[in-house]
Amino acid sequence: MNRIKEVLDKKGIKQTWLAAKLGKSYNIVNGYVQNRQQPRLEVLDNIARILDVDVVELIVSSKKK
């Protein structure tokens, strides 16, 4: 599971913008956001760089259980 959706929502960024920056289709990015598929590590690292967050923020919840 990843937290791409939460980070996008927090930053007010649209999936279409992220897809364009990644050079991937909206459908691919939507699959990542909806957790239907997981990005490869290098793609996850690229997403983190584009969103200006630590890659850990995309995979580890900051909420305490």
Describe the predicted segments one by one.
Residues 42-57:
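DNA major-groove recognition helix of helix-turn-helix/homeodomain DNA-binding modules
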Residues 12-31:
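Short alpha-helical DNA-recognition segment
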Residues 8, 33, 51, 59-62:
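DNA major-groove recognition helix of helix-turn-helix
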Residues 9, 20, 49:
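Alpha-helical residues within the helix-turn-helix
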Residues 1-14:
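A short, Lys/Arg-rich alpha-helix, primarily the initiator
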Residues 1, 64-65:
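Short intrinsically disordered terminal tails
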